């Protein structure tokens, strides 16, 4: 198995519920290490740029509004098969379909306010990490 890095966002709904620590604990208990992390309030331009691939979709405006509605925690996770492992921990995008014990089943409100984002491929992880972090901000552990 290969050590990978993946990108994660703890979204405004989860930050507002004060469950950041509980979510990070799930990552760490599953063998993922946080190698970069920061809380930030996304600007409209940052959210639009990050989600640019969805710009033509009907939900884009609502997504940008939600992601700018409060602070988020952006982080880089590292570990064996980090991308797949993180996606398993998150659960299905729609929390009603997420398996019991997953982050979204336990902390998400809806398909829109679904607590977390995680990269879905190595290419996406590289792009998303670079969007928020300079190489010097990511520290191997």
UniProtKB/Swiss-Prot annotation:
Belongs to the NDK family. It holds the Pfam family NDK. One of its GO terms (biological process) is CTP biosynthetic process. GO terms for molecular function: ATP binding; metal ion binding; nucleoside diphosphate kinase activity. Major role in the synthesis of nucleoside triphosphates other than ATP. The ATP gamma phosphate is transferred to the NDP beta phosphate via a ping-pong mechanism, using a phosphorylated active-site intermediate. Gene3D superfamilies: Nucleoside diphosphate kinase-like domain. Its cofactor is Mg(2+). GO terms for cellular component: cytoplasm. It is found in: Cytoplasm. The keyword Flavoprotein does not apply. ATP binds at residues 11, 59, 87, 93, 104, 114. The active site is at residue 117. It catalyses: a 2'-deoxyribonucleoside 5'-diphosphate + ATP = a 2'-deoxyribonucleoside 5'-triphosphate + ADP; a ribonucleoside 5'-diphosphate + ATP = a ribonucleoside 5'-triphosphate + ADP. The gene is ndk. It is an enzyme of class 2 (transferase). InterPro entries: NDK-like_dom, NDK-like_dom_sf, Nucleoside_diP_kinase, Nucleoside_diP_kinase_AS. Keywords: ATP-binding, Cytoplasm, Kinase, Magnesium, Metal-binding, Nucleotide metabolism, Nucleotide-binding, Phosphoprotein, Transferase. Homotetramer. It comes from Pseudomonas fluorescens (strain ATCC BAA-477 / NRRL B-23932 / Pf-5). Its EC number is 2.7.4.6. The keyword DNA-binding does not apply. This is Nucleoside diphosphate kinase.
